[in-house]
Amino acid sequence: MPKMKTVRGAAKRFKVGKNKIKRGSAFRSHILTKKPSKRMRDLRGPHYVDGTNVSAVKKMLGV
């Protein structure tokens, strides 16, 4: 049986660590002037894939 191909869009969006899958943060790309500084601070930092989606993301990444 051949190897499963990685979903290339998922490979560009997610990074796999030891036990968690890191993802980018939404709401940080444009129209930033109207968003409060507190919200922008809270959007900084690492974000991880929710536990309910981990198996689907792993399947896309071939992990």
Curated annotation (Swiss-Prot):
Does the UniProt entry include the keyword Ribosomal protein?
Answer: yes
Q: Which GO terms describe its cellular component?
A: cytosolic large ribosomal subunit
Q: Which molecular function terms from Gene Ontology are attached?
A: structural constituent of ribosome
Q: Which UniProt key words apply to this protein?
A: Ribonucleoprotein, Ribosomal protein
Q: Which GO terms describe its biological process?
A: translation
| Keyword match Ribonucleoprotein | yes
Q: Which SUPFAM superfamilies match?
A: L35p-like
Q: Which family does it belong to?
A: Belongs to the bacterial ribosomal protein bL35 family.
Name used for this protein in its record: Large ribosomal subunit protein bL35
Organism listed in the record: Campylobacter curvus (strain 525.92)
Q: What is the lineage of its organism?
A: Bacteria, Pseudomonadati, Campylobacterota, Epsilonproteobacteria, Campylobacterales
